[in-house]
Amino acid sequence: MIRILQVVNDMHRAGLETMLMNYYRNIDRERVQFDFLTHRPEKSDYDDEIVSLGGKVYYAPRLYPQNYPAYFKYMKQFWAEHPEYKIVHSHIDSMSYLPLLTAKKAGVPVRIAHSHNTSIDKDFKYILKQLFRYGINSVANYHLACGSEAGRFLYRNDDFKVIPNAVDAEQFYFNADVRAD
């Protein structure tokens, strides 16, 4: 079985997280298993379901500049304890630079950056996020995006593959009983 480490901020019920769960619920989990590295110390909405589907959830330090020394220490230990991960797939846009850098240093052969945004929030990490955006191509060896604009934004070129977001269409089929309510 192949285990893929999905890197996210958390697994609360939001757009990216729900899309990942749609994929996860529908893959052949006998052949491929998703595990999740989150950046929140507390349990998220989907954690119990992930475990029930055979996945694992790891809690890394938050990606705040003051936590970077602790983050790098955590990730160095994480990769030393988990050599089973040969594929890491990061969904945290320009911040993917940090986990993918540590994965590269640890010798993880497949490092995927996945762009889901077309801009960077102008928060206190704005300058760092811009710098990380310029470094992402040096640490990721596969580039994915949910759309062309998101890909061009993060990678600053056309060297990426577009994977449209997964939507469970059955949730949106007409249902007379639901309409009656």
Predicted regions and their residues:
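N-terminal strand-loop element at the rim of the active site
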Residues: 2, 6-70
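Short His-centered aromatic/hydrophobic patch
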Residues: 90-96, 115
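An amphipathic, basic-hydrophobic alpha-helix
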Residues: 52-56, 62-87, 97-101, 105, ...
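Carbohydrate-associated surface elements
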Residues: 149, 166
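Short beta-strand scaffold positions
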Residues: 90, 145-146, 162
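A conserved, positively charged/aromatic
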Residues: 105, 112-146, 154-155
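A short helix/loop element that forms part of the nucleotide-sugar donor recognition site in Leloir-type
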Residues: 75, 173-181
